[in-house]
Amino acid sequence: MSEPLKPRIDFAEPLKEEPTSAFKAQQTFSEAESRTFAPAAIDERPEDEGVAEAAVDAALRPKRSLWRKMVMGGLALFGASVVGQGVQWTMNAWQTQDWVALGGCAAGALIIGAGVGSVVTEWRRLWRLRQRAHERDEARELLHSHSVGKGRAFCEKLAQQAGIDQSHPALQRWYAAIHETQNDREIVGLYAHLVQPVLDAQARREISRFAAESTLMIAVSSLALVDMAFIAWRNLRLINRIATLYGIELGYYSRLRLFRLVLLNIAFAGASELVREVGMDWMSQDLAARLSTRAAQGIGAGLLTARLGIKAMELCRPLPWIDNDKPRLGDFRRQLIGQLKETLQKSKSSPEK
């Protein structure tokens, strides 16, 4: 038997059709556009350290006021007058055969020439330090570029500036790994993984040595003024050593500028990182109960020296940090604690013998 038909069901509202997503039109790129195409970094975060450093540098930079321009103009006019008067004195001494005055003019000319030469040398070294920041920006662009032809020359220039010989094993491995079909991003990336770690390892060893010396000096010494002078002197030497390793010759003003940039970077960007990496670990291990007050102060001084070296390394390095290869403060912290414990154990065991 057939089943009876079900009655019709009427709905109050008509059925709603689900909206379908419309497809976008096809986009085609030319060959020239495909070469310069670079993927956008969605999760890329702005560099807080650079923003803070630029803000403070702009705040501390003196404004070009009218009085400053008048003073600079007066100094320039005075210098020109001194040079003109010196030329006139020299001519008069030569005409009157006053050899004593002529010798004084010659000595003054030598002093002025030495002063001008030192100013030019300082300016050139300061310009070289500023160029390192531009080279780092250029390297960052090459690491995101798909073009061909600039990466090899750029890396060879960096190797020459750092004093790396052509027969160096790391540079030979880099030459063997690159070929003509690779773009600039791949060539610079290979240089960053094969050649740059050689210089970074030397800089890490220098930071470890200077931080250990600062830690032991503060932990052993009991004179605050001597400690402060020693730490300041060693920190300046550390900055000079790191700059020399990366091929930067520092003068007086360039050294002050680098030291100022490092301190500003530490003050604005390093405080939170220092608390995060050091404070929680110290609280968890209760180092204050295990070590003496002088030892704790020594560890703090060593960590600040290590932090100073890391930031100097970052400012002198020609390439940006990639693949989390930036040295961490925790690595130096564990090393400093181990060295300090060994020193304290040796000092305690020596009187017993």
Swiss-Prot record:
The chain crosses the membrane at residues 70-90, 100-120, 213-233. Belongs to the UPF0283 family. Its main location: membrane. Residues 1-35 are annotated as: Disordered. This is UPF0283 membrane protein YcjF. Keywords: Cell inner membrane, Cell membrane, Membrane, Transmembrane, Transmembrane helix. It is found in: Cell inner membrane. The lineage of its organism: Bacteria, Pseudomonadati, Pseudomonadota, Gammaproteobacteria, Enterobacterales. One of its GO terms (cellular component) is plasma membrane. HAMAP family: UPF0283 (MF_01085). Signal peptide: none annotated. Residues 1-19 have a biased composition (Basic and acidic residues). It holds the Pfam family DUF697. It is a multi-pass membrane protein. InterPro entries: DUF697, UPF0283.
